[in-house]
Amino acid sequence: MKKIYGAFFLLLALLAPAALGQATSTTIMMYMCGTDLQSACVMDMYEMASVDVPDDVTIAVQAGGAYQWDDSDLTGEAVNRFTISYDTFNDLQTLAWQNMGDSQTLCDFIDWAAGAYPADRYILVLWDHGGGYNGVCYDETADYDSLTIHEVNDALYAYQQRHPSFRLDIIGFDACLMATYEMAAHMASYADYMVASEELEPGIGWNYQGWIGDLAANPEMSSADIAVSIADQFMAACLSDNPNDYLSQSVINLSAIPTLKAQLETFSAYLTDALENGQMPTISRLRQRMYSFGKFSDASSDQVDFMSFLDATRQFAPNMASQLEATYRQCILYSTGTDMFDYLTGMSLFLPGDNVSDFIQDFSARYDCGETYPNYSQFVYGYATLLAGGNYHFTLQKPEQTTGAQTGGLFSSMLTTAYVPGGSYVAPDD
C-alpha cells in the first residue's frame, strides 16, 4: 500500500505544474538611447523601478547614446547594462562605448538579454527619438546616427539566424512616428505584435508604471492584452498631462501583414500604371489633401494614414482597394488617439509631399526596400522623382496593355488597363 501511495504522490508531483499551470515568465528588453532625452529616459527607468515586479518578470536594460545621465549610477559615452527591480538597478555593468544607432549593438543587446534572462515571452522596446522611415534611436555620441528600418531588421535577422526558435511577442517603439507600414512589413518576420504611434509622442512617452504594473498584477495576461495596456496607459498618462495634445498609439497584428503586403504590391502596380499614363497631377493633388503626421513640428514626416492613402487612391483600382481595406482592418488589433485627426486608423505609410528632394537623396541608404515590397518602393521613388520634375523608368512587371486580357503571375487577378483615345485615363476593371 505504501508503494501505491508513494507512486501516486510522485505522479501528482510530476503533473502538478502542468495541471495547475506554470507561471509565464516574461523578459522586457529595454533598448534606451538617451540622447537629449536622457532626463526623460531616467524618469522612465524610475517608473519601472516603482513597480514591484514578480520573480518571473525581468526588466533588462541597455542605456547608451548620451554624453551624460541624470542618474549618477549611469556613465555617459558608454553602454550601461542592468536589470530593474523594485527601487533598484541590479548587476550594473559599464561597457565600452558602442553606437546605439548600429545594428550590431542592438543584436548584441538582444543576445545578452535573451541569453542571461531566458523566458517564455519576450518584449523588446526601442526608446528614443523616432522619425518614420529615417529610423529610431539617434545616438548623440555618434553624430546622431540612427537605426534605420534595415538595421532593426538586420539585428533581429542576425539573432534569429543563430536562434531559429526565437520570436518576440511584442516589439514596441516608445518614439515618435514609428507605427508605419514599412516597419511593420519588416517586423512581421520576428514578432507577433507591434506597438507604436502614428503621430509624435510627448516627452513623457509611455507609462511604464502603468503597463508594467498591469503585468505585475497579472503575469498570465496575454501578449495582446499587454500590448493594449501599453496603448491605454500611454493615453491615460498623456491626457492627464495635456488634455489637448495630439496623441495616438496602435497595436498592430503582425500576423496579418504578409497578406497586406502582397495586396499592396498588386495595388501599387495599378498606381504605377496610372503615373505612367498621365495621372501624376491627379495623384499629386490627392496627396496634398492627406494629413502628414508630425507636421506641426519643425518639419513634416510625409507619413500619412494608411486609410487616408487608400481612400484617396481607390479610384485607380476599386475592387483591389476593397480587398486591401478588409485585410488592413485585420492588421489593426487596437488603435486609440485623440479626435484631432481626420484619419487615425492605426498605421501610416510614407508618401512624399514636403520633403521630396531629401527623400530622393536618402532613398538608397534609408528607404529602399525593394527586397521586401518592390512595387510599393518603386512607386514611392518614381512618384517622388516625377514630382521633383525628373524622369523615371518603372521596371516592375505590369500586365500587357491590351483590352481585357487576363494576366498571370503576381497580377493574375488584374485586368489590363483600357485607354480612351486622346489620353484620358480609365481605371482598370479590376
Segments from the language model and where they lie:
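Terminal, contiguous helix-loop blocks that mediate binding/assembly
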Residues: 23, 133, 137-430
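Structural motif corresponding to the C-terminal cap of alpha-helices
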Residues: 13-15, 114-117, 156-163
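N-terminal extension/subdomain marker
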Residues: 22-118
